[in-house]
């Protein structure tokens, strides 16, 4: 699992829309019901980084047919983890062989992006070793791959009503079951996502 360096953070994603740029860092993207993309349908994406050069996020509600125990085995780690049975998430279509850990505790890992007071993103192997040994962050999720947007692409998709946006709530990432996260985020907008059409958006 490679480190997350400054080049990675801005590789394959960057936006500049007309008018004043507004960053959606530490926001959720809630897929509109009409979004038919097989990767992002009914998805909830946490935006980790968003500048005028692009955006990067992790999908937090798409479980794979893979567990943390499988990852530990692939990395030849001794598995003492109480969380070994937890599902690995499909974080997005970019760098799908690479692991990313979203977690609450900041810790002292080799490659951590501090996104919000209670949300961090680490892409170095040391955190996986710690999780395998039950010494990792108390609240975390493990994803393979990430979602990336080039300059202006995310803004265009929001204008096209592909996404709803809302400031992120870390409890949805870490405390709510995977299958409930999409609807839970939408409820914070005061809507029932299951009753929405694809003809209205919120930016």
Curated annotation (Swiss-Prot):
SUPFAM superfamilies xrefs: VC0467-like
Superkingdom of origin: Bacteria
Recorded GO CC terms: cytosol
Gene3D superfamilies for this protein: VC0467-like
PANTHER family: UNCHARACTERIZED PROTEIN YQGE, UPF0301 PROTEIN YQGE
Family from the record: Belongs to the UPF0301 (AlgH) family.
Protein name (record): UPF0301 protein Sde_3637
């Amino acid at each position: 699992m490679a480190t997350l360096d400054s080049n990675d953070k801005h590789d394959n994603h960057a936006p500049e829309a007309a008018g004043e740029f507004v960053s959606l860092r530490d926001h959720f993207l809630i897929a509109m019901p009409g979004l038919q993309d097989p990767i992002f349908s009914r998805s909830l994406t946490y935006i980790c980084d968003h500048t005028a050069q692009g955006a990067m996020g992790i999908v937090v509600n798409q479980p794979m047919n893979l567990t943390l125990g499988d990852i530990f085995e692939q990395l030849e780690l001794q598995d003492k983890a109480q969380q070994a049975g937890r599902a690995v998430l499909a974080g997005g279509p970019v760098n799908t062989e690479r692991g990313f850990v979203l977690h609450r505790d900041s810790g002292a890992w080799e490659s951590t992006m501090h996104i919000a007071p209670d949300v961090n993103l680490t892409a170095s192997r040391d955190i996986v070793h710690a999780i395998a040994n039950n010494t990792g962050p108390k609240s975390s999720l493990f994803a393979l791959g990430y979602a990336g947007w080039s300059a202006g692409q995310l803004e265009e998709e929001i204008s096209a009503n592909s996404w709803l946006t809302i400031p992120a709530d870390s409890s949805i990432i870490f405390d709510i079951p995977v299958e409930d996260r999409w609807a839970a985020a939408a409820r914070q907008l005061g809507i029932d996502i299951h009753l929405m059409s694809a003809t209205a958006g919120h930016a």
